[in-house]
A protein has these predicted regions:
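Bacterial N-terminal signal peptides
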Residues: 7-17
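Conserved "turn/edge" positions that cap or connect secondary-structure elements
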Residues: 18-338
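Cellulosome-associated attachment modules in secreted, modular CAZymes
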Residues: 299-303, 329, 335-393
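Positively charged n-region of N-terminal signal peptides that target proteins for export
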Residues: 1-4
Length: 393
């Protein structure tokens, strides 16, 4: 089968595209404070919240084609979007109902906002969604009004993930296939700790570092890398793996605090900020770090600044965050790397990339060869290489 496919693809007409970088300031209709919290795999969809008055935030979904779309509420006056599926079609977050209670929602163009319920209480929030949009995680009140981390699917509804021996927990992110959930939970002493949950292990503490309530965590595609911000003495960005434990990310000279908000699919790129929204930063597992304001100064221009990076696409190419350009504005940064179709990320779309897709053809799972991040290596991924063949070489 692969031999026939090779013959077919080698006979195809190749198209070459250039390598480009860009910075887009999102038009959210002049709201003075906009926070993007999620970006799709190809950078074409951004979700988050805008706020013009206290308690009047609105969940939004922005696309390159249509601009900003407000997703509404569940009958109340406020909402916020926290996560988006890989293809941008599923959005999750919270919205006020008619009683002013926060309720976790899952949105699609076909269904609109759907209330996901709670765990016996009145309120809930969705914080993360799996790559294909079928698994949602967050927190919900139980019958005692305590926050409990949940994992939701259409088949199971909300499942309480428990705690680390204390009263409350919150889930923040989920792996691409929905099997690994990360967040924070109280231990028996009432301290908040980071956790990693699977159906096999249950909730496992990430170590002894403490966290503030509502501390943000993110997880790599396969669930093996967790990033976030721990306390107590000062906010410090970290990267966790089972092999290394929790490792603090380096600080640039003169900085005192750091925040990590997003991680790439392979776990090698972490984005966030340093010094209380002063500079958007990017860290790499190799130890390199850079201030996005310096690296992309030619795109930003005078008088503007990238304050914070809040999410990064699975391949690490697209970064969203909050900047200042007279008012707080959301931005979408296209770093230009990796090129579309560049499976091995060496800057050149060539035979090596083509062969990797061919030999992985039909395989399921979120991997480098799955270029469109839909969970299977198929024709779409093959075409992505073909249409960019020769780029950068």
């Amino acid at each position: 089968m692969r031999r026939h496919m090779v013959c077919a693809v080698m006979g195809a007409i190749m198209a070459t595209a250039g390598w480009s970088q860009s910075l887009t300031w999102l038009d959210t209709q002049f709201n003075p404070f906009t926070v993007p919290l999620g970006v799709s795999a190809d950078g074409s969809v951004v979700v988050g919240m805008t706020e013009s008055f206290p308690q009047q935030s609105r969940a939004f979904r922005w696309t390159r084609a249509l601009g900003t779309q407000y997703l509404g509420t569940l009958g109340g006056n406020a909402s916020a979007a926290y996560g988006v599926s890989a293809n941008g079609s599923v959005v999750v977050g919270w919205a006020h109902d008619v009683n002013g209670q926060r309720r976790a929602f899952r949105w699609t163009a076909a269904t609109g906002m759907v209330d996901l319920g709670a765990l016996g209480g009145n309120q809930s929030e969705a914080r993360g969604v799996s790559a294909e949009g079928s698994v949602v995680v967050g927190w919900a009140h139980d019958v005692n009004g305590q926050r409990r981390a949940f994992r939701w699917t259409a088949a199971t509804g909300m499942i309480d993930l428990g705690t680390l021996g204390g009263a409350e927990s919150e889930a923040w992110a989920v792996s691409a296939d929905g099997s690994v959930v990360v967040g924070i939970a109280q231990d028996a002493t009432g301290e908040w700790r980071g956790f990693r949950w699977t159906a096999q292990t249950g909730m496992i503490a990430l170590g002894t570092r403490t966290f503030s309530r509502d501390a943000h965590l993110d997880v790599s595609a396969d669930g093996s890398v967790v990033v976030g911000t721990h306390t107590p003495w000062r906010e410090t960005a970290f990267r966790w793996t089972e092999a290394t434990g929790m490792t603090d990310l380096p600080l640039p000279s003169g900085a005192s605090v750091s925040f990590a908000y997003g991680v790439s699919g392979d776990g090698n790129i972490v984005v966030g900020g340093v010094d209380l929204m002063a500079r958007a930063f990017r860290w790499r597992s190799s130890g390199e770090m850079d201030d996005l304001n310096s690296t992309y100064a030619n795109l930003i221009g005078g008088g503007a600044m990238l304050w914070l990076a809040t999410d990064v696409s699975p391949d690490g190419r697209y970064i969203v965050g909050v900047g200042m350009r007279g008012v707080y504005e959301a931005y979408l940064l296209d770093t230009g790397f990796p090129r579309r179709g560049d499976v091995d990320r060496n800057g050149c779309v060539d035979d090596a990339d083509l062969l990797r897709v061919l030999f992985a053809f039909g395989e399921r799972g979120y991997r480098d060869e799955d270029l469109n991040w839909d969970g299977i290596v198929d024709d779409a991924d093959l075409l992505a290489v073909l249409f960019q063949f020769g780029s950068g070489c």
